[in-house]
Design a protein with these regions (language model features):
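Terminal ABC-like ATPase head and other globular end-domains that cap long coiled-coil arms
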Residues: 1-153
């Protein structure tokens, strides 16, 4: 419903503000077409730097990853608040980090480390080599001959 979408955006924007250093705010598109908005959550983004509202589709790969992460974490928080004690303590991220520059990678990892310190289990599936030094416990999957070998580091 509309109330849930608004609440999720409030939570998502707290995270988006952190990840974008205050540059971006996610906004619901105006209900100009009435009826379209009930099919899903159509978003724009307010760019604090330019002062303009633009389509979320214009975000770069790294910015899109930050928006997606913000929305996922915002949805998780909203479900926990509204579902009477249900806790979502696990998050898996499959790739996505490859589009981030080093500063954005730092911001994303800091956000995920905060979740880790809140006793959340964060699983990251990635080929980004910069992550190897940042992640304490790793499962490394390598192809050897005709099979995959898993190693705990």
């Amino acid at each position: 419903s509309d109330v849930y979408k608004r609440q999720m955006l409030i939570y998502a924007n707290v995270i988006m503000k952190q990840l974008s250093q205050g540059r971006y705010q996610l906004l619901r598109k105006d209900d100009a077409g009435k009826g379209r908005s009930q099919q899903g959550l159509e978003l724009d983004v307010f760019d604090q730097e330019s002062g303009n509202i633009r389509s979320i589709k214009t975000l770069s790969g790294g910015e899109s990853f930050k928006a997606a992460l913000s929305l996922a974490l915002g949805l998780s928080r909203m479900v926990q608040d509204y579902a009477g004690g249900i806790e979502l303590n696990t998050l898996f991220i499959d790739e996505g980090f490859g589009s981030l520059d080093s500063q954005s990678l730092d911001q994303a990892m800091n956000c995920l480390m905060e979740l880790h310190h809140e006793n959340k289990l964060i699983g990251i599936i990635s080929h980004v080599s910069d992550l190897k030094d940042r992640i304490e416990r790793q499962l490394v999957v390598e192809r050897k001959q005709k099979q995959s070998v898993i190693q705990m580091i």
